Amino acid sequence: MQLRRLASFFVVLAGLVTASVSAYAADPENTMIITLKDGDVTIALRPDLAPKHVAQIKKLVRDHAYDNVAFHRVIDGFMAQTGDVKFGNMNKGFNAQAVGTGGSDLPDLPAEFSQAEHYKRGVVGMARSQDPNSANSQFFIMFGPAPPLDGQYTIVGNVVSGMDLVDKIKKGDEAENGTVTDPDRMIKVRIAADK
């Protein structure tokens, strides 16, 4: 009997989480669409978790800063990292040696860590240096769960469609910390409300 109640609890909980993420995806102002070579990835941004980070991402999207930026670090089974708008633009000034070390001209952001959300497949988090208050423009999309990141990196969204396309992003060499030779890119990034 208790096992049945526990199972029912988890079914209800899963439904609430799905409904919560779907509700964010239904908000065009907080829906980011990334065009990849094989199609579009839709991300529900989470201003409820990270209002400053989401605001900065949306500004960079609207400034077209993310267009043509490489997925410079991609580790199979872990994550795909992009967003280095200083050194990662494949059409303007791509620097294979420096990509991953740059950000935007906007200020770095104070950490907005969540204890309620966890790093799992499809979660989008902000990359940073050792300083927890150093996130700027780079972000990553998770291929699978990574509990060590929970409460250590700011969560900014969830992939709501197109995760199969994220899975196809060219992977890097694990021996080289996922550095990708001839990387895939974000062709275009937009906020759904701006169509």
Give the label of every model feature segment.
Residues 2-3, 9, 13, 20-195:
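Cyclophilin-like peptidyl-prolyl cis-trans isomerases
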